[in-house]
Amino acid sequence: MPPTLDDQLISMSYYARQQCSRQWVHFMAAMFAEFEERVGPIEADRFLEALGSRMAQSLPLPRCANLQELENRINSVFEDIGWGWVRIFEGDGFIEILHGAYPNVPQGEQWRSWLVPILEGIFTVWFAQQGGDESCVARLAAAPQSPGAPLIIHYRRRDHEGAAVGG
């Protein structure tokens, strides 16, 4: 389901309630840029996805009876750590996660490439904790079309190279 104007307004309202710490912005941007330059983008993505997996393991979710309960649990965790909100939809052969008001670092568009693998690791582990198939992974399906628009992530079966199968 594509994000709507209401989804963007929800994110803007969320950002207005949050206080982003400016003390780490430049440090984190420099650290990630240096890290990616030294190890390359593929290894950086693997590391960041593993970091997201570890975050999810440190913030485990109890088994949920349905997607609505899972959405509520994820939103509760994300509210506690200031990482935005999600809406979860069942698709044809995948589960779609609409993630808005994700951490925002005002350092250009490059930061998004660092955040996405972290989120992919988090969602992959959380869905596995719900009894998800080990052959499934969370992968970015669509980047935001405008600033503040939600990310679209699909949880689905992976191919032999680790990419999610289908669109």
Show which residues each predicted segment covers.
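Short, hydrophobic/π-rich interface segment
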Residues: G91-Q145
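C-terminal edge-of-domain segments
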Residues: A141-V165
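N-terminal accessory segment detector
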Residues: M1-F94, Y102-R112, S146-G148, A163-G167
